[in-house]
Every structure is written in C-alpha cells, then in structure tokens.
C-alpha cells in the first residue's frame, strides 16, 4: 500500500512542478492594469445618498471606492504636453454619464 502511494506521489510531483506558474515582473507604480490613467478634477468617496442616487442613474457604485468627476485620459509618457494638476488615478469602471466620469478610482504615482 505504501509503495502505491509513493509511486503516485512520484508521478504527480513532476506534473505539479511543471504546472506552477513562474513569478512575473513586479509592476511599476505608474501602471494601470485596467486601461488608461485619468486626470480627474474632483475625487470623492460616495456616501449612502450618492450611492442611492447612482442607482437611479443606472450606475453601480461601491461605497468603499473613489469616484472621479470631470476626468480626461492622460498619457503616462506625457506625450503632447499632457499634464495633470490634480492627482492622476486609475479607474476600473469608466462610465461616462452626465454626472460621473469614472468609478472605483485609486491614486497612481506618476511623474508627469
């Protein structure tokens, strides 16, 4: 019985070793995984009132996330003279409605 378990373990070990993903490169602090980096004139955390109002607009809001208002995409390289006087942000949900430009935003450290 022990020999069967030992043989099974020896057969399974190479399969586990080859299936393990290699660690990737660490990401730069200025990288935005979900798209472009935006410059938002105003950022705020939603409260229950704005979250309820957003439901009426059809825009789901996470109460723990930042909202971005009056946002424009910026280039990480600063090509074309793009700069951001406010804090650059990376947003997971770019829903451009009449009131809210970006959802679930987090600040990004970018030297523009």
Curated annotation (Swiss-Prot):
Disulfide links within the chain: 32-90, 39-84, 40-71, 91-105
GO cellular component: extracellular region; fungal-type cell wall
Induction: Expression is transiently increased ten days after fruit body induction and appears to be associated with rapid expansion of the mushroom caps.
One GO molecular-function entry: structural constituent of cell wall
Domain of life: Eukaryota
Subcellular localization, as worded in the UniProt entry: Secreted; Secreted, Cell wall
Keywords from the named record: Cell wall, Disulfide bond, Fruiting body, Secreted, Signal
Keyword Ribosomal protein: no
Tissue: Expressed in tissue fractions consisting of undifferentiated white hyphae. Not expressed in the outermost cell layers of the pileipellis but in the cell layers adjacent to that.
Chain segments annotated as coiled-coil in the UniProt record: none
Alphabetical list of InterPro entries matching this protein: Hydrophobin, Hydrophobin_CS
Signal sequence annotation: 1-19
Location (main, coarse): secreted
The UniProt record lists the keyword Signal: yes
Job of this protein: Aerial growth, conidiation, and dispersal of filamentous fungi in the environment rely upon a capability of their secreting small amphipathic proteins called hydrophobins (HPBs) with low sequence identity. Class I can self-assemble into an outermost layer of rodlet bundles on aerial cell surfaces, conferring cellular hydrophobicity that supports fungal growth, development and dispersal; whereas Class II form highly ordered films at water-air interfaces through intermolecular interactions but contribute nothing to the rodlet structure.
Family: Belongs to the fungal hydrophobin family.
Assembly and oligomerization: Self-assembles to form functional amyloid fibrils called rodlets. Self-assembly into fibrillar rodlets occurs spontaneously at hydrophobic:hydrophilic interfaces and the rodlets further associate laterally to form amphipathic monolayers.
Protein name per Swiss-Prot or TrEMBL: Class I hydrophobin A
Organism field: Agaricus bisporus
Gene, per the UniProt record: hypA
